């Protein structure tokens, strides 16, 4: 009997087991689409980034002019750049939703999958920061100066680290060249981490909205969920096209349309919107070293979730108090992002400190406490067999 080609060929067999015959829980919803959408966004960002790199000059004297050249003179250059900018915003929007879905439905219980995902998130944040500096606008220059200068908070070797990153005694030509190289290379590292993420995911299997054993009822990924993914791709592409053509500079800062000038400081230095929650936490603490520590912890706190939340139920679907805590965390995250865009003055300073405290309080104390109390209540009402 002749074997099916997709099951017999050594290479195609790997693709088949990951995309065609993959056993998937029958009840997963569209919230499970965002992983594949993130893969599409990463591919589009690399493709458009490669084209932009061909026309970009990594020199402090030419960088801003080369961006103007791309927009004005390169065939469809304005669209490719706008596509790259809008794609980055949508990439982070999908990533935040993907992480939120993972918290809500208990995906952090698959520790290897969760950790590789957090590493991907941190890599994406670092890559976006490098890319923000490249146009060498006013906000790019000052954001690079402020953020890289945070390394000076490291005891003993902080100043040496800052000068190594800068390639001199201030942000300049060597800094720009290094950031271009890193902005170019890290996405390829993200591809490798993404494959590892998929490998760990397929080892344990996907979670499901009910939080039940997913092995009870599974169906092949194709055609049941592949077509749902295609719909997600079409919506994503539509949003990127609409954003690139109708609202291309919706998320960009007006100061970045002015060439970098080290003698003029912008009245309010702020990063892109997807950094604002961490930036608000950084600014909320007057001490520099503690501010940097809080900034790192704002991302690293996700690594502690598998050990902090010990719910008997995997999903929050049947945990009303955990649901309330989750949406409190989401509301606090949105408020932090808004405060990060505000000037550092009263009352925003006090609000930033309160919301920063709440951010860590929810993750480190409220989630574990509520999950413990709900476990205790469930065990008292419905004792295990």
Curated annotation (Swiss-Prot):
The UniProt annotation places heme b b566 binding at: 98, 197
Q: Name one Pfam family in it.
A: Cytochrome_B
GO cellular component entries: mitochondrial inner membrane; respiratory chain complex III
Q: Name one GO molecular function term.
A: metal ion binding
Which PROSITE patterns does the protein's record reference?
CYTB_CTER, CYTB_NTER
Key words of the record: Electron transport, Heme, Iron, Membrane, Metal-binding, Mitochondrion, Mitochondrion inner membrane, Respiratory chain, Transmembrane, Transmembrane helix, Transport, Ubiquinone
Binding site residues for a ubiquinone: 202
Gene Ontology BP term (one) = mitochondrial electron transport, ubiquinol to cytochrome c
Cofactor annotation: heme b
The family database entries (PANTHER family) matched by this protein are listed as: CYTOCHROME B
Task: Tell me its family.
Answer: Belongs to the cytochrome b family.
Instruction: Give the protein's recorded name.
Output: Cytochrome b
Species source reads: Myxine glutinosa
Name of the gene encoding the protein in the UniProt record:
MT-CYB
């Amino acid at each position: 009997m002749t074997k099916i080609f997709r099951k017999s060929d050594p290479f195609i067999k790997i693709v088949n087991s990951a995309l065609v015959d993959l056993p998937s829980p029958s009840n997963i919803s569209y919230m499970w689409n965002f992983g594949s959408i993130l893969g599409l966004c990463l591919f589009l960002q690399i493709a458009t980034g490669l084209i932009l790199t061909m026309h970009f000059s990594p020199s402090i004297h030419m960088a801003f002019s080369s961006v103007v050249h791309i927009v004005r003179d390169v065939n469809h250059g304005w669209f490719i750049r706008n596509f790259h900018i809008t794609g980055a915003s949508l990439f982070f929007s999908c990533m935040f939703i993907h992480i939120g879905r993972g918290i809500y439905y208990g995906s952090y219980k698959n520790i290897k999958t969760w950790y590789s995902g957090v590493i991907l998130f941190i890599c994406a944040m670092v890559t976006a920061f490098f890319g923000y500096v490249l146009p060498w606008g006013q906000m790019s220059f000052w954001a690079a100066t402020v953020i890289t200068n945070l390394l000076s908070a490291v005891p003993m070797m902080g100043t040496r680290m800052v000068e190594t990153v800068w390639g001199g005694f201030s942000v300049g030509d060597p800094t720009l060249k290094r950031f271009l190289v890193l902005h170019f290379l890290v996405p390829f590292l993200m591809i490798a981490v993404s494959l590892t993420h998929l490998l760990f995911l397929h080892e344990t299997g996907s979670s499901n909205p009910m939080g039940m054993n997913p092995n009870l009822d599974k169906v092949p990924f194709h055609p049941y969920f592949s077509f749902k993914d295609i719909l997600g791709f079409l919506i994503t592409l539509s949003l990127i096209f609409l954003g690139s053509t109708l609202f291309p500079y919706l998320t960009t800062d007006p100061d970045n349309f002015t060439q970098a000038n080290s003698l003029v400081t912008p009245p309010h230095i702020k990063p892109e919107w997807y950094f604002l929650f961490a930036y608000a936490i950084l600014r909320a603490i007057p001490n520099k070293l503690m501010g940097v520590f809080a900034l790192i912890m704002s991302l690293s706190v996700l690594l502690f979730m598998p050990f902090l939340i010990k719910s008997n139920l995997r999903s929050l679907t049947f945990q009303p108090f955990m649901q309330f805590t989750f949406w409190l965390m989401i509301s606090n995250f949105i408020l932090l992002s808004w405060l990060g865009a505000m000037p550092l003055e009263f009352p925003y300073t006090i609000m930033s400190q309160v919301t920063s405290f709440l951010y860590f309080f929810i993750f480190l104390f409220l989630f574990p406490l509520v999950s413990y109390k709900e476990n205790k209540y469930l065990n008292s009402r419905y004792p295990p067999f």
